[in-house]
Curated annotation (Swiss-Prot):
SUPFAM superfamilies: Aspartate/ornithine carbamoyltransferase (SSF53671). This is Ornithine carbamoyltransferase. Belongs to the aspartate/ornithine carbamoyltransferase superfamily. OTCase family. Keywords: Amino-acid biosynthesis, Arginine biosynthesis, Cytoplasm, Transferase. Pathway: Amino-acid biosynthesis; L-arginine biosynthesis; L-arginine from L-ornithine and carbamoyl phosphate: step 1/3. InterPro entries: Asp/Orn_carbamoyltranf_P-bd, Asp/Orn_carbamoylTrfase, Asp/Orn_carbamoylTrfase_sf, Asp_carbamoyltransf_Asp/Orn-bd, Orn/put_carbamltrans, OTCase_ArgI. It is found in: Cytoplasm. GO terms for cellular component: cytoplasm. It is an enzyme of class 2 (transferase). It catalyses: carbamoyl phosphate + L-ornithine = L-citrulline + phosphate + H(+).
Length: 306
């Protein structure tokens, strides 16, 4: 049996994805009821962060601790990863001492190379191309508030970035329609779009994408690693703010999500996070529960191989 990783959403089947989402809500109920559940005593998660993080780091670390295991935070600044030790060598060594590894980095090929030399499951905690863990939380949150997302319409407003790519995969796997509203030149890359013509439509207007949507999602205009483009992007994205007026074009029950951190006054209006249909705080909390369900799935799959 092959070693299972989670580098993009499509490393799971639709069936597995749905069962992880249901399990996430079940683990959430248990956690809220203060039930102790420690199936992974002695298991160690390694967390490699080449970019900053609040939610991803805390949710993974808290999650493995709640399961009875522990986590090691590894930054390139303090390890040999930052001094040029090859990914392949690092992967062999690091994975020989750990039970599961999470990586947040730049190029998606870095997590792929790490995974291909790893002896244990590898989770993508965000690359320049994908943020699949965030999608687990977003899908869980939609399901908890509105039921099945199948057949619904989701509007992605803003940059055709890593989050947008993961939304395209989710649309394909979960059976919803994705309307992407991006400024010219900032649409998702053609190589990602190519596969998803059946479920993704691109507009160069936020309004056209938002009409009748059941969920509106946005993200920062300049992602980590694009800080130098901030000023240029502020101009290009000026008419792509999610605000009360944009929400008014959508379905009355339309939810609002943002992976956070958010920039009030840029991609969202000052009060958007507090909009009556905003579920951003549940979305952030669900990172914990969704990733616990993911780690449980991967650790159990790996145990079956032994
Ligand atoms: N949404 C998200 O991944 O947040 P962090 O960058 O804080 O981990
Ligand atoms: N697109 C953003 C997401 C942050 C969680 C980034 O890559 O910086």
């Amino acid at each position: 049996m092959a070693l299972r990783h989670f580098l993009t959403l499509r490393d799971l089947s639709s069936l597995e994805l749905n069962s992880i989402l249901d399990r996430a809500s079940e683990l959430k109920r248990q956690q809220h009821a203060n039930q102790v559940y420690q199936p992974f005593k002695g298991k160690v998660l390694g967390m490699i962060f080449e970019k900053s993080s609040t939610r991803t780091r805390i949710s993974f670390e808290a999650g493995i601790c709640q399961f009875g295991g522990s986590a090691i935070f590894l930054s390139p600044r303090d390890t040999q990863l930052g001094r040029g030790e090859p990914i392949e060598d690092s992967a062999r060594v690091i994975s020989s001492m750990l039970d599961i590894v999470m990586i947040r980095t730049f190029g998606h090929n870095i997590v792929e190379r790490f995974a291909s030399f790893s002896k244990v499951p590898v989770i993508n905690g965000l690359t320049d191309d994908h943020h699949p863990c965030q999608l687990l939380a977003d899908l869980q949150t939609y399901q908890e508030h509105r039921g099945s997302i199948k057949g619904k319409t989701v509007a992605w407003i803003g940059d055709g970035n890593n989050m947008c790519n993961s939304y395209m995969e989710a649309a394909h796997m979960m059976g919803f329609k994705l309307k992407v509203g991006s400024p010219k030149g900032y649409e998702p890359k053609p190589e990602f779009l190519a596969e998803f013509a059946h479920c993704v439509e691109v507009f160069n207007s936020a309004e056209d994408a938002a009409v009748n949507a059941d969920l509106i999602v946005t993200d920062v205009w300049a992602s980590m690693g694009q800080e130098e483009e901030q000023k240029l992007r502020e101009k290009a994205f000026l008419t792509f703010q999610v605000n009360e007026a944009l929400m008014a074009l959508a379905h009355p029950e339309c939810l609002f999500m943002h992976c956070l951190p958010a920039h009030r006054g840029e991609e969202i209006s000052e009060n958007m996070l507090d909009h009556k249909n905003s579920v951003v705080w549940d979305e952030a909390e669900n990172r914990l529960h969704a990733q616990k369900a993911l780690m449980e799935f991967l650790l159990n799959e790996n145990a079956k191989r032994a």
